[in-house]
Amino acid sequence: KTAMEFSTTTARAEAVKTDAIAVGVFADGELTPSARALDKATRGSIKAAIQSGDMTGKRGTQLALRGLPGVAAARVLLVGLGSRDDFSDRAFAEAVRSVIKASPGVAEIAAAATEWAVKGRDSEWAARQFAIAAREAMFRSDELKSKKDDVNGPSKALLIVPARHVGAERGLKQGTAIANGMALTKRLGNLPPNI
């Protein structure tokens, strides 16, 4: 399987036609802007999931909602981001990896990850880290196996940005290049020295 491809879109969250769209929810039930937009488009489905206790917003949690009316995506993946005050670089990377790992059989996923604000970080940083963490979640070391592991995660990832944003596009390109280098290094490190 080829490496995951990344691109940006400026479409509104509810209008992105994709297999899955990932939006963030903080631990206090606070919705990120795209989650609020999806909640409005679905007449309260996101808030209903929070009020019922199905989604707590606790760091590392996810909830997939399928076939929501008013949303172009086939499923909405709510991603628990934890406490806004404690949301760090590490928490951002964990959230991205959890999105990818929670998306088996999905060919394309969109994520509003630039909204998952880490203090002191901009959208270029978020885009770069998104690409690195997503590719890291998809990495498999099976060069020497006769039967390769099935990689059934997304092959395309769309990063939703609020407006045409050169920094986010540059960050995605940088992140993709860094992820390619990291994957090559891991593959070479996993090979025996006599190859």
List the model feature ranges, each with a label.
Residues 1-195:
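N-terminal hydrophobic/helix-forming segments and targeting peptides
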